[in-house]
Amino acid sequence: NILIMTFGKKAAEHMADVFRERFPSFSVPFFCTIHSFCYRIIRQAEAEGLIKKYSLIVDEEDDPVPEAMDGETANAWIVDESPDEVPSGRTKREDKKKGNRYANPRSPIYLLEKILTKLEYCKKQSEARTFAEQAATVIGCLKNRMMTDEEILRPLPINMGADKRVSIWPVYEAYQKELAEHQPPEMDFDDMLIHALEVLDNPNMQAFWQRKYPYVCVDEAQDTSLLQHAIVQKLHRTGDSLFMVGDDDQSIYAFRGAMPEAMLTFDRRYEDAAVHRMGVNFRSDQQIVLSGDGLIQRNKARAKKTMEAFSKQPGEIRIIDISAARQGQFLLDQARRFCKKQEGGENPESLAILYRNNVSALLPLAYFFKNDVPFVGNKVFDILTLLYSRTAINILAFLCFVLEPDSFQAYSSAYPVWNHYHGLFLNRETAVENLRKQMGEENSGGPILPKLQALLRSLGEMDKARHIGEIWTILQRIQAEDKPDFAIMAMLKELEYNKNGSMKQKNVQLLVMALIRIASLYDSILSFVEAMLALRTKRKWDEHNADKHPVVTLSTMHSAKGQEYDHVIIIDAVEDLMPGDRSKPLPFWHASWQDHVEEERRLFYVAATRARHDLRIVVNGLNSSSPKAPSPFIHEMLRDNPNIPVEKLAADDALEEQIEEAMGIPYFAVRRGKTPGIHREYEKAGVEGYSCPVYRRCTTWRKANRFLNKAVSCPVPETETAPDLPLPVEKALLRLFSVQQLKELDANRLKKIRQKTGYLFSKEAIAAKAVDYAACAPEY
């Protein structure tokens, strides 16, 4: 008659196993997740006819990829998104493949994909899954926060990519209508909690469950939502029947509706409640506990407590300052060290590599795969799914066309890469159809692009023919070089793929940069393509790690919660990811930037305290204002404990600069003005009205840094008086503006004059000089 609820299924199973081991003579209490318990409540109510029968919908099925998916050519494998038949018997019109699984047509994500497409929130089908996942997160959060329809009608946005945010209400309304109108009616996991609470509103059902489980224990209480707390309150009887365990410093699931405030107010919510604070960490050594405690003490919204280490060992924390290009080799060396210990018969120690976002794991994963280093991972499949993104598919398809320039299929697949080149915008189907007629189905006439160029010339499309010729020249140079990293960077820069709209998204940028770094490991384009295709397949993945008993774990910070390892390496501890970009709009579950930073600090604290003995934190550019500046949490730890050693490893600046150049992301270097320094956005640079010698738009951070630190022999004066300018400069100004325009300057004209002359004129100074200018050059 004891009910013990926890956050995850594995945790519940582990607790039950530990209980059986330690108390073999006792009957085992009911260990479960809160969702599985609510499912029991609903099924009991259905059996008694108190509510109508609901069908529970879930997300992904575990159907394996059929052997038929291993196409005869690499290109076919890349572009074929689903076979004609899937294992469940549904056709590909009904299923959308995600990686090597198939979405259930009645899953929340699949339904939201259809709804977003129908409502025209997504112009491209390739965008639908990403936005559907974001919409599912928002909908789940607002349900767990018990928000009313009136509250949801307010503009709660979904982040739909770069500079695009839309209201959730139309999506939410259509989604709930789809579930309600299905026969039988459907519910998702969050609806299951809502229906369970409605059942417990019935006094008879509430009394039934209170009698069945007079004692309730809730583990990981900081992760429960307002809705889940309401269910717990319904199960609670008067007296000492409720026991909750949690750590508000480990509350990291605000996006799921977690509200640690309910736990912090426990003694006010329940009559005669007692709160016991545990201040001893039994996992980590002293330095790790000390640094973690100093970090988390900076949060304001927390219970007052101080953590101490039970261990008497000092432990070790080390900051590793290394370039992103070298990070993969560093992690490979560390993993090999632990594998050698295991092979040598030593007691194996565990190593975990933790990261904020899945894209950070792609580089070490590729290194391990290439060098046959066994490892396990929490949600590794989500990392591999990145290789099925539209951007990754376009890159691999382009490389396949470089390898097979005479293939119609390869041309058709790679077509989106160069279609924006100089505004080419060819109709793919028309071009291919005309080429097929001209050259025959088998295309025995050689490479396609020269033939396409000739076809366009015959149609009088001379500009487009010239551009196709330029593309073919670029492809020939890539073929001659035969370096996959060079090929991807040429695709970005020379074929202008870096101007593609999706490249504005931060995650896409990180993915492309990771692929370039991985490509630099391979000697040829073919070997890189083959490796990426092998990495994408779950079957190959299983073969890679079979029976190797790996001691290395790859995990997100969120998934690592509740785990512990002898050694932990936190990678990509940079400001862009931890706590993120302040200029981006906050999700609605954070009321302020401070709330967001405090949750990110809690997440960093959770990751750091997974380590028992050794913690290493990998940063980029610790002692500079580089584009990957270290997380402020690193500086906080160093201020609290300045004795933490910082180890600076050799950097590969050449590759990093080439990557930045290819990405085409501008940096604004400002020598003087309101915001001197290096900025990623023009608005942040604050250079409106300042002359070119004061600021410069650079294609890489290193170029911007060189400009910023370069000695200026003739500093540009800030003047209220128009100086005597060389006559050619005055004539050039008068070609741009008339005397009258100079007398009546608007902001745009003033900006142009400042840029052309290099002087920070005032409007009044220019107007006063206007007549003198005319006298100097009367012909103007």
Regions found by a protein language model. Give the residues of each.
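Helicase P-loop NTPase motor core
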Residues: 1, 271-274, 279-373
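ATPase/helicase motor core of nucleic-acid motors
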Residues: 36-37, 313-315, 345-485, 498-501
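C-terminal accessory regions
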Residues: 574-651, 656
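Conserved helicase core region in the C-terminal RecA-like lobe
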Residues: 32-41, 216-220, 245, 359, ...
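Accessory C-terminal helicase-associated subdomains
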Residues: 174-175, 347, 413, 449-559, ...
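P-loop NTPase Walker
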Residues: 1-56, 63, 67-94, 207, ...
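Conserved helicase NTPase motor core
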Residues: 1-3, 30, 64-65, 160-265, ...
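ATP-hydrolysis module of ASCE/P-loop NTPase motor domains
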Residues: 26, 49-173, 182, 186, ...
